[in-house]
Amino acid sequence: FIPCSEGLLQFTDDGKFVRSVVKRGQGPGEYSIIRFIAANDRLKQIYIMDNGRILTYTIGGDYVGESKIPFCWQFTLLGDSAYVGYIYNNTGQKKDRLVLVDRQGETLNTFPQYDQFTIANGLNYYLWGYYDRYLYSFREEACCKEYYNDTVFTVTPERLEPRYILD
């Protein structure tokens, strides 16, 4: 699946176009902007983060439902019933780094942001690339690797567990 201005496009493993999976619009099951996507191969579902919500679809494009999520930079799945959202510390003063939210939009847990800094008034600090992934799923585990951190973490409902330290 590839998100683009035309929607969420599905391709075969060898690169052949299959279809446009979902529709942009303001109606039920439609998105206004694709901020980020995730997929669950086992459940055969895809998830689109769209300003304050996550829309769920089947691989075939059928609308399943919607969940509310606080504004996040990226997200990934945590098991079958929760999401992990990454809060980018662009002001230097964000209190939280990650937020865990269930499918009903209830906050389950947050993980603090320890990297606090001061920047000139009215400015934001961005150090990222368009294809950077701070959160991702690997073997059905949620993982987090920040741009300026040497540690890859596994995210559990209770804590961040160091998984790898990169030299």
Pin down the residues of each PLM region.
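Aromatic (tryptophan-biased) beta-strands that constitute blades/sheets of beta-rich domains
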Residues: F1, V18-V21, Q45-Y47, G65-E66, ...
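Surface-exposed loop and turn segments in beta-propeller and other repeat-based domains
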Residues: R19-Y31, E106-G129, P162-D167
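Blade-loop segments of beta-propeller domains
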Residues: G7-F11, K16-N51
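Short coil-to-beta transitions that initiate beta-strands within beta-rich domains
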Residues: Q26-A38, P70-C72, N124-S137
